[in-house]
C-alpha cells in the first residue's frame, strides 16, 4: 500500500508518500490546473496500487475527494487543530506539513473526523442557498426602507403590504433615486418566488426524515432549523455528551484562565455558522411561545445581558435537540435535558 500525506492548496498539492512493501519514500508537488494531480492518481489506479491519502479538512477540495472515491482510494480527513497540536518542529512549510501528515498516518495517530456523504453535502447547499437569499432580500428591504425614511415616511413593516408598496412607488424621487427604487423592487420581486421554492423544497426534505420531524416537536424549532441540525450534526453517536454539541457549534465562551483566575471571553465561533445562527433564532422563538423558556431567558437577561442570554439559550436548545435525537423521544415539557442525561447516576437528565 502507498500512504500519502497531502498538504492541499486550491492550485496545487504537496505530497509525501511511502510504499509500505518496499519502503520507498518520496516527495512531490502536483499542479491542479493542468491535470497533473489527476493523471498521477489515475496512473496509480491503472498500476493496481492500493492507496491511502490523508489530508486536513479544507475547502475547495470536493473534486479531489470525488476523484479518490471514483478510483477506490481510501481518504482520511483530519482535524486541522489536532494536527497542528501534534507538530514538534517550529518550522512550517508545505513539505513539513505533508511529512507530518504522513508520519501521523504511519504511527496511527492521525485525528480522523466524520465526513458527510455527498447527498448530505448537496442538501446543505439547499439550506445555505436559501439562507443567503434571505440575507440578500433583507439587505434590499433595508435599502428600500432607507429610501422611504429619507422622504419622511417611516412605515416599518407596513411598507411590505400592498398599500405600502403602492405608496412607495408614488414617492417623488430624484432621477437616480427613482431608478434605484425601481431596480430594488424588481430584485425583490424576483427573489421572493425563489425563496418560496427553496423553502418548499426544504420542507419536503424535512418530511422525509423521522429524526427531523421529531426535533420539530420542540417549541420554536421549524423544518429549516431541524433539517440543518440533522444535516450538520450528521449522527448523535459522534458526541459523548451534550456539552460537546455546544463546543462543536461554537456556542461556548473562549477561555484564558491562569493562576486560579477564570477569564471567559466571547464565544469561540468555531463550527458551522449557519447552525449557530439558526439555533439562536429558534431559541428566541421558543422564548416567545413557551413560558418555561421565557422565564429562563428573562432570568439570564436580567443577570447578564440580552445578547448573552440569546446565545446561552441557543446553546441550551442545541443540547436539548441532541438528547431528543439520541434518545429517540419527542419534546415533553415535563422532561428536563442536561448535558449528561441518560448516563449512570443521572437517569432523569437533570444537571
For each of these PLM feature ranges, what is it?
Residues 54-63:
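Acidic, metal-coordinating catalytic cores used for nucleic-acid/nucleotide bond scission
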Residues 1-19, 101, 133:
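Gly/Thr-rich phosphate-binding beta-strand-loop-beta motif of the actin/hexokinase/Hsp70
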Residues 128-214, 340-341:
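Glycine-rich, often acidic, oxyanion-interacting loops/wings at catalytic, nucleic-acid
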Residues 11-36:
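Short glycine-rich, Thr/Ser-proximal phosphate-binding strand/loop in the N-terminal lobe
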Residues 34-52:
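Short, basic/hydrophobic alpha-helical segments
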Residues 76-128, 132, 167-170, 261-271:
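Short alpha-helix plus adjacent loop in nuclease-associated cores
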Residues 301-351:
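Basic, amphipathic alpha-helical segments enriched in Lys/Arg and hydrophobic/aromatic residues
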Residues 93, 214-217, 223, 227-307, ...:
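Phosphate-backbone recognition surface of nucleic-acid-processing proteins
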